[in-house]
Design a protein with these regions (language model features):
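Long, low-complexity, acidic Ser/Pro- and Gly-enriched intrinsically disordered regions
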Residues: 1-92
Length: 92
């Protein structure tokens, strides 16, 4: 397994076990896809991490740059992230 493959396997395991520190550690070694970055943002919310808001805003920037979404989609995604900050323990 390549170093990146190993890091991705660790990232996946960390998400499954809701291990924030391990997920962050593995993510530093990867170029996360938009989907995986969102999974990390949700883990921040679940753990009520003070990093949640900044991570959510950075994810929104990537979403806008990489997806070319319609305005309605941007509004829905933004509202969903804002709600997510106040919900804890729900599955990703």
């Amino acid at each position: 397994m390549t170093a990146e493959g190993h890091a991705y396997a660790r990232f996946q395991r960390a998400l499954e076990h809701r291990a924030l520190w391990a997920a962050e550690d593995a993510a530093r070694e990867l170029q996360l896809s938009l989907h995986d970055a969102l999974r990390l943002v949700h883990l921040y919310a679940d753990r009520r991490s003070p990093k949640f808001e900044r991570a959510a805003l950075r994810w929104l920037e990537r979403y806008l740059a990489e997806s070319s979404p319609r305005l309605q989609s941007v509004a829905e995604v933004t509202a969903s992230l804002a709600r997510r900050e106040h919900e804890a323990g729900e599955p990703i």
